């Protein structure tokens, strides 16, 4: 290889998802969003855009920065329910919470109807299994455009 020749894959990078409320420069590990495999991630349109459970977290956390950067306004929202509390390292910033999906959609300024549809379709497609958040398990969805 000659000096200055391109190397690697320019479409790939090691980039983690961080809380958008973190400091502009280097929020550090305390701003990394680790809840991704325990819920869903939606874009500004309220739609999922990748399989959140493709692999268990220690192997896949570094792809989410790139995936979110490819979304409109480079924003994604990791959404979990109360069952996920305590199963991941929270960011230093408190989570946004709501008793309703509509209320959450208003807080994050995305279309409530789209978010509700995404969550309803996801929940309806869920196939129960033996849950283990530390390894690939047999919990999944079936019949979605992007299955988990």
Which residue stretches match the model-derived regions?
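Residues forming the flavin
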Residues: 1-148
């Amino acid at each position: 290889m000659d000096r200055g020749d391109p190397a690697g894959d320019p479409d790939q990078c090691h980039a983690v998802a961080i809380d958008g409320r973190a400091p502009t420069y280097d929020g550090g590990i305390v701003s990394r969003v680790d809840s991704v495999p325990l819920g869903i991630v939606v874009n500004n349109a309220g739609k999922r855009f990748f399989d959140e459970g493709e692999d268990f977290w220690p192997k896949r956390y570094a792809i989410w920065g790139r995936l979110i950067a490819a979304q409109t306004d480079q924003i994604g929202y990791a959404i979990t329910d109360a069952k996920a509390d305590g199963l991941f390292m929270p960011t230093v910033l408190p989570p946004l919470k709501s008793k309703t999906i509509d209320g959450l959609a208003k807080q994050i300024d995305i279309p409530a109807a789209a978010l509700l549809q995404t969550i309803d379709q996801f929940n309806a497609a869920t196939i129960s299994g033996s849950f283990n958040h530390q390894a690939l398990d047999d919990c999944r969805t079936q019949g979605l455009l992007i299955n988990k």
